[in-house]
């Protein structure tokens, strides 16, 4: 038996969720896609996607490894990756940059024509979830410059960026490149450092109107 205590707020249960018998889900809670709720749990706050959660109150005890599909991105993907880019910058990067800075940075992706130019100059790949939605993307050019790496705010810490980085590093080797260079944000620096990238210099790089702090990093393959 399963109890939903809704009061005035809705409960959202996303696709491929399993909820054990005797569980109680309180008002306003969202249970993310692919998650498992243990029997008899009391879900008092939202549960993220792809995890196992149990207890009273219900807590995440294990992350489930989601399966992603990698494919090249084309012009028809522009609207989706533009929205992902904007939302990621405004949310994920806001912990390291001011509101004015992230808004200026996000505005760099407003132009569809600019995205077309980027797709023409770089090889873009996307990571897709089980529903075919793009949850992250990255790009590399034939000279070994890693141009972009962005992961949807709801898919942070779930292996998306690690998979994308592995794929673009394979691309670089295929180009015959022995060193990758990349400009990374304050937010992304720890991720790249853990994967063997070294800071060459700190700089102030122009976004749209403003100059933001980032780092030139390199890795020898």
Q: What does each model-identified segment do?
A:
Residues 172-185:
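Conserved GNAT acetyl-CoA-binding A-motif
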Residues 1-27, 65:
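Flexible, glycine/small-residue-enriched loop-and-beta-strand segment within the central core
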Residues 181-183, 198-216:
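Conserved catalytic-core motifs of GNAT/GCN5-like acyltransferases
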Residues 22-34, 41-44:
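Beta-rich strand-turn-strand
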Residues 14, 26, 152, 183-185:
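Residue-level recognition of the GNAT/N-acetyltransferase active site
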Residues 192-193, 197:
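Conserved active-site tyrosine of GNAT-family acetyltransferases
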Residues 72-75, 83-154, 165-167, 171, ...:
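Acetyl-CoA-dependent GNAT
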Residues 65-79:
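Conserved N-terminal entry element of GNAT/NAT acetyltransferase domains
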């Amino acid at each position: 038996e399963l109890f939903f205590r809704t009061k005035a707020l809705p409960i959202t249960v996303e696709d491929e969720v399993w909820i054990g018998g005797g569980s109680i889900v309180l008002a306003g809670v969202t249970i993310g896609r692919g998650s498992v709720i243990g029997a008899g749990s009391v879900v008092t706050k939202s549960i993220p996607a792809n995890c196992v959660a149990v207890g009273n109150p219900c807590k995440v005890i294990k992350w489930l490894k989601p399966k992603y599909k990698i494919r090249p991105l084309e012009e028809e993907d522009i609207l989706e990756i533009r929205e992902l880019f904007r939302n990621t910058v405004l949310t994920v990067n806001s912990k390291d940059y001011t509101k004015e800075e992230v808004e200026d940075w996000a505005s760099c992706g407003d132009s569809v024509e600019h995205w077309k130019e980027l797709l023409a100059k770089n090889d873009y790949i996307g990571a897709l979830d089980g529903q075919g939605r793009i949850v992250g993307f990255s790009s590399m050019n034939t000279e070994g410059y890693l141009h972009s790496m962005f992961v949807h705010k709801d898919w942070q810490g779930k292996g998306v960026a690690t998979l994308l980085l592995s794929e673009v590093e394979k691309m670089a080797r295929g180009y015959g490149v022995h060193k990758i260079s990349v400009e990374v944000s304050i937010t992304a620096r720890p991720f790249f450092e853990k994967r063997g990238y070294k800071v060459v210099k700190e700089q102030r790089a122009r976004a749209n109107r403003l100059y933001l702090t980032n780092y030139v990093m390199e890795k020898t393959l």
